[in-house]
Amino acid sequence: MIPAKIPAKARTSLSYLIIFGLLAGVYLLPADTSLSEVRRGGLLRACIPPIYPPLVTGDPSAPGIDVELLRALAEKLALKLAITPNPAIGQDFNPRNWRVTRAQCEVLAGGVVASPVTRSFLETSPSYAETGWGLVSPKPIDDLQGRRAIVLTGISGLDRLALSRFLRSKSVEFTIAPNAAEFVMALREGRVDFGATEMLLADQIAAREGFSAQWAPEELPRFPVVFGLWKGDLTLKRAIVDGLAQIERSGEMAKIMARYRGGRAGSRKG
């Protein structure tokens, strides 16, 4: 703060000097070369979990939503896609726990959500889908009270304790599925009334099996699914934002989503 004892003219001059000094400081900051460095290397390097269906499936013929979007992005940027598996991604929603470094990749995918924790650590792309707990059943269910359920947690970073509390509040008897096959079998055989799992996976299972999928009630939170980038990589972020917009406008994004979610389109949010 400028002291009040300084004459008015001097205060005005000093104010201008401070403003010009700040502007000069901005111009002297190192230029963001993230996009030019990526173009120089010819690679868009992405860290993803080995498997996180339907974002990452491990199936070469249908590799997952995020893998297909990353391939399309790399093509838009005239780059080759290089994938580095990281088993920690998606096990929780805190990227600080994933031990990923800038030396490994420019983009993080396959379980990144635009939470305050993520945004304190990473830049994020626009959202192209939502995640949260979803419910799967052979037929739509209006009232969960007193029903039987099976829960498939997988490696999802969703809050399992919150789901457990919610189910108990509805007097739902539930078991934990060891894998997706047992989850589906319990629904097919009528051993349970509904299943609870991550919503993107719920959509995929419902589309494949002819079941119904719906969001869990709103007391269980939902999160925007995004790509993560390193703080300060603004030129690369702008290129990725533009690339995603092109993929959406062309209809390619909707086609990718439909292949894995039975026609339910994802929504992009800033």
How should each PLM-predicted stretch be described?
Residues V56-T57, R71-P85, S125, T153-P178, ...:
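Ligand-binding cleft/hinge of the Venus flytrap
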Residues S15-Y16, S34-G111:
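Extracytoplasmic small-molecule ligand-binding "clamshell" domains
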Residues M1-K9:
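N-terminal Lys/Arg-rich, disordered targeting/topogenic segments
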Residues P49-P50, S127-V136, M199-A245, R261-G270:
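Periplasmic-binding protein-like
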Residues T12-L29, G64-K76, K139-L158, R165, ...:
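Extended ligand-binding regions for polar small-molecule ligands
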